[in-house]
Amino acid sequence: MSDIIDEVISSFKTSSIFINREYLLPDYIPDELPHREDQIRKIASILAPLYREEKPNNIFIYGLTGTGKTAVVKFVLSKLHKKFLGKFKHVYINTRQIDTPYRVLADLLESLDVKVPFTGLSIAELYRRLVKAVRDYGSQVVIVLDEIDAFVKKYNDDILYKLSRINSEVNKSKISFIGITNDVKFVDLLDPRVKSSLSEEEIIFPPYNAEELEDILTKRAQMAFKPGVLPDNVIKLCAALAAREHGDARRALDLLRVSGEIAERMKDTKVKEEYVYMAKEEIERDRVRDIILTLPFHSKLVLMAVVSISSEENVVSTTGAVYETYLNICKKLGVEAVTQRRVSDIINELDMVGILTAKVVNRGRYGKTKEIGLAVDKNIIVRSLIESDSRFADLWS
C-alpha cells in the first residue's frame, strides 16, 4: 500500500508538466496585473492621502467573480504600505469566511495587537475595545471587507454602522473602509446613513474579454509550466470558455491548472484540448458540491423540491409548485416550514450562485409567473445533497 503513496509522491516531485503550479492559484498576486491599470491608478489616487497620514475616502468596489477586485486591492495596499512605511496599517477580512459580527470585531482587534477570547464578550464590549485600540494605535487604519454583501444579507448593516461611527470617537487615528462585492445593487440595501458614509467612492470592475484572459493566462503559464508542454490552442480554449462565463479570470486559471493536473495524472507530456473539457466538468462538479455542502438546511430542502419536480413529466416548476413540494418534504422530515416569500428569496439566491435558473415568463391571460429549473446536472446535485445530509437519500429513493 505504501508503494502506491510513494509512486504518487514521486510523480508529483518529478512533474513533466509543471514548474510551479502555485502561479495558477487564485490567491497568488503577481508583480503586474494586466488590464487593470485604470483601477489600480484610481484606487491608488484615492488612498494617496495616507502618505500625509490623512484619512482617504471610503471605497466600494463592484464586479463579478474573477474580475480582479481582491487582487487589485491587495496589490495596491501592499505597494503603498512599502512606500509609506509606518504611515498606515491595512487589515483584510473576507466576511464570507469570518462570518459573524463577533469574529469581524475580534479579528480587527487582533490586527491591532489586542487579544480577545474566541467567544464570551458582548458586541458592545468588543466595539468599546476597538475604539480604544484605534485611539491608542495613533496611525491610519484601512479595513478591507471582502464579500461584504453576503455578510450584510445575513446580519444586516448594524456592524457597518458601528464601524462607520468609530471616527467620531477618536482624534488623530482614523479608520477608512474598502468594501468589495459581487452585487452592484448591494449599496441599495444599506441604511442611508451607512450608505452616505461608506460609499464615498465607487469603482466598477468590468469582466475580462477573451483576449485579455489569453494575455493573463500566457503570462502565468510562462512561470507555471515547463517549456513545450502547453500548446497555444489550449490557452486560447481556456480563455474562450472563461470569457463565455462572464470573463472570470479565476475560472480561466482554474481551467488551465486542472487541465495540467489531468495531463499529469494521465502521464502525458503535453496538455491537450480534451483535458480542458475534462477539467471544465471536474471544476463544475466540485463547485456545485462546495456550494451545496455550505447551504442552509432550508435552502437544501428547496433545492430538493426543484429536483423532485424536474423528475416529473409535464410539470412546470413554478414558485407555487416548488413551495407545495417543499411543504411535503418538510412534513416527511418533521421540520417546520418557512414562508412562501422566504422560499421565493431562496430560489433567487440559488439562481444567483448558478445552481438554479429562475426566469419570469408571460403566460398570456394567466399573467406572469416564474419558471424554475436546474442550472447544473441533477445527479451532481442529488449526490451533494445526500453527502451533506443522509436524510436526502430517503427522500430520493
Swiss-Prot record:
Molecular-function annotations in GO: ATP binding; ATP hydrolysis activity; DNA binding
Posttranslational modification: Autophosphorylated in vitro.
UniProt induction comment: (Microbial infection) At least 4-fold induced following infection by Sulfolobus turreted icosahedral virus 1 (STIV-1) in strain 2-2-12.
UniProt xrefs under InterPro entries: AAA+_ATPase, AAA_22, Cdc6_C, Cdc6_lid, ORC1/CDC6, Orc1/Cdc6_arc, P-loop_NTPase, WH-like_DNA-bd_sf
Residues in the signal sequence: none
Residues reported in the UniProt entry to bind ATP: 67-71, 208, 220
Stated role: Involved in regulation of DNA replication. May play essential roles in origin recognition and cell cycle control of replication. Binds to DNA, with a preference for molecules that contain a bubble, a fork, or a tail. Inhibits the binding of the MCM helicase to the origin DNA and strongly inhibits its DNA helicase activity. Also regulates the DNA polymerase and the nuclease activities of PolB1. Stimulates the DNA-binding activity of Cdc6-3.
Note in the entry: Strain 2-2-12 is a substrain of P2 that is highly susceptible to infection by Sulfolobus turreted icosahedral virus 1 (STIV-1).
Family affiliation: Belongs to the CDC6/cdc18 family.
Subunit structure: Monomer. Interacts with Cdc6-3, MCM and PolB1.
Protein name (Swiss-Prot/TrEMBL): ORC1-type DNA replication protein 1
Record organism: Saccharolobus solfataricus (strain ATCC 35092 / DSM 1617 / JCM 11322 / P2) (Sulfolobus solfataricus)
Gene assigned in the entry: cdc6-1
